[in-house]
Amino acid sequence: MAKTEIVNQLDQEFGRLIESLRDLINSVPPDLLYRNPPAVSIAENILRSAAAVEQVCGGITVNLWDDPFEWTLPETLSNAALMIEYLSEVDLARRRAFNAISDDEALSKYVSVPSGEPCRLAGLLLDTLVTAADYRGRALATIKILSGEGTQGFII
């Protein structure tokens, strides 16, 4: 097994997630992006997904754990083009973070997180990937609800 096989796989999964968020934005009519169903809007779920990735990648590379909430507000990222631009910034942060991980052994190291409890890098990355993918799934479900497809065929 190569020294960076796991790191590369994690990097690819985060890259796929960001790319799927771009595809999702491009597939949604502009009037639906911030339309609110009984839950959170499509755009807000997409941005929460990307923000989770941005926060962890910023924490890993420059120990900046700020919540991207302020610069991911609907007023700031008000259309698909601005959201795509933000995803490019998140993708750049992802690349920097994964370039900083030297090999698979580095994933077993502990990192300091805002909660004060150190955690293993691998666990932090996996938790973030799960959280970001969950928000992506919520965005997809909201698209189905708003487009009238309902929840038939959903696997719960």
Predicted segments, located by residue:
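Extreme N-terminal tail/first-helix region
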Residues: 1-13
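Short, contiguous alpha-helical
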Residues: 11-12, 22, 30-72, 112-156
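Short, flexible helix-adjacent loops and helix caps
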Residues: 26-33, 103-106
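Amphipathic alpha-helical packing segments from all-alpha helical-bundle domains
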Residues: 17-24
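Residue-level recognition of alpha-helical structural elements
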Residues: 3-6, 34, 38, 79-83, ...
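Acidic/histidine-rich alpha-helical segments that form the ligand environment
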Residues: 75-112, 119-138
